[in-house]
């Protein structure tokens, strides 16, 4: 019985140590298809490699939050870091600017990454 108590304590200690590890998210913003003005497309924001899992992701049009956004389920990699995909349908043009804003404990303020239509 003493052995099982020791094993249980070691497991709890190792799990509590996971919460202390923090990794900043990598943010990638891209369209599903090459951008063509006036042609419907999908804007994607792929956020990966972050820990802990608490995160807030917003897609922006001209600095304002886009309301109709969908996302994948929160998933994790082999290294226990997390990843998510946020996406929305949009129609690019010359005047509108699109971006992805991410809030995470590893950032002192939210980080915004602009969509580069040439990518």
From Swiss-Prot:
* Reported function: Component of the class I major histocompatibility complex (MHC). Involved in the presentation of peptide antigens to the immune system.
The UniProt keywords, alphabetically, are: Disulfide bond, Immunity, Immunoglobulin domain, MHC I, Secreted, Signal
Q: Does the keyword Membrane apply?
A: no
State the signal peptide span.
Answer: 1-20
Subcellular location(s) of the protein: Secreted
Q: Where is the Ig-like C1-type domain?
A: 25-114
Q: Which PANTHER family match?
A: BETA-2-MICROGLOBULIN, MHC CLASS II-RELATED
Task: Please give the superkingdom of this protein's source.
Answer: Eukaryota
Similarity comment text for this entry:
Belongs to the beta-2-microglobulin family.
* Pfam families per the UniProt record, alphabetical: C1-set
Subunit note: Heterodimer of an alpha chain and a beta chain. Beta-2-microglobulin is the beta-chain of major histocompatibility complex class I molecules.
An example GO biological process term is: antigen processing and presentation of peptide antigen via MHC class I
A single cellular component GO annotation: extracellular region
Q: Does the keyword Endoplasmic reticulum apply?
A: no
Which cysteines form disulfides?
A: 45-100
Gene it is expressed from: B2M
Protein name per UniProt:
Beta-2-microglobulin
